[in-house]
């Protein structure tokens, strides 16, 4: 059974994905997501923080992620990009959530929406990113 927070993360990734693919305005995307049946079981506050925070800071997050990639940024799968951007926001702006939880949730969301081994790629990038963004947080794995 999925928690409200997991649903919020999944919906935020779907919203970020839509913004990457369709270039639709964030308020319109959020409205569409809120109309989805799963939204009633989600944490609306977390969804809003993740989606709108990611949208606001996406350019900065891309700058942080780019040096960690093993491929050209243009070759990133849009789902992987959406997961990485959303997790980068959570790592940067939500210190109350331990980074291993953020990474695990990102892996699970990638398993749901991404390609066969996409979760392994996301895990590797987020491990490096967490070490940069939260160098003083003890490793909890």
Curated annotation (Swiss-Prot):
Protein name from the UniProt record: Transcription antitermination protein NusB
UniProt cross-references to InterPro entries, sorted A to Z: NusB-like_sf (IPR035926), NusB_fam (IPR011605), NusB_RsmB_TIM44 (IPR006027)
Gene Ontology molecular function: any one: RNA binding
Family listed: Belongs to the NusB family.
Keyword check for Transport: no
Organism of provenance: Neisseria meningitidis serogroup A / serotype 4A (strain DSM 15465 / Z2491)
Record's keyword terms, sorted: RNA-binding, Transcription, Transcription antitermination, Transcription regulation
Single GO cellular component term: cytosol
Pfam family, one: NusB
This protein's record includes keyword RNA-binding: yes
HAMAP family attached to this UniProt entry: NusB (MF_00073)
């Amino acid at each position: 059974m999925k928690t409200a927070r997991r649903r919020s993360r999944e919906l935020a990734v779907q919203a970020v994905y839509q913004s990457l693919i369709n270039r639709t305005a964030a308020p319109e995307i959020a409205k569409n997501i809120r109309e989805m049946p799963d939204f009633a079981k989600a944490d609306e506050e977390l969804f809003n923080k993740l989606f709108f925070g990611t949208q606001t800071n996406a350019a900065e997050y891309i700058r942080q992620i780019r040096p960690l990639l093993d491929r050209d940024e243009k070759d990133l799968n849009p789902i992987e990009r959406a997961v990485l951007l959303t997790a980068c926001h959570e790592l940067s702006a939500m210190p109350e959530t331990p980074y291993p939880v953020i990474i695990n949730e990102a892996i699970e969301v990638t398993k749901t929406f991404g390609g066969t081994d996409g979760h392994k790629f996301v895990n590797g990038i987020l491990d490096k990113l967490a070490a940069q963004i939260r160098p003083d947080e003890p490793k909890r794995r």
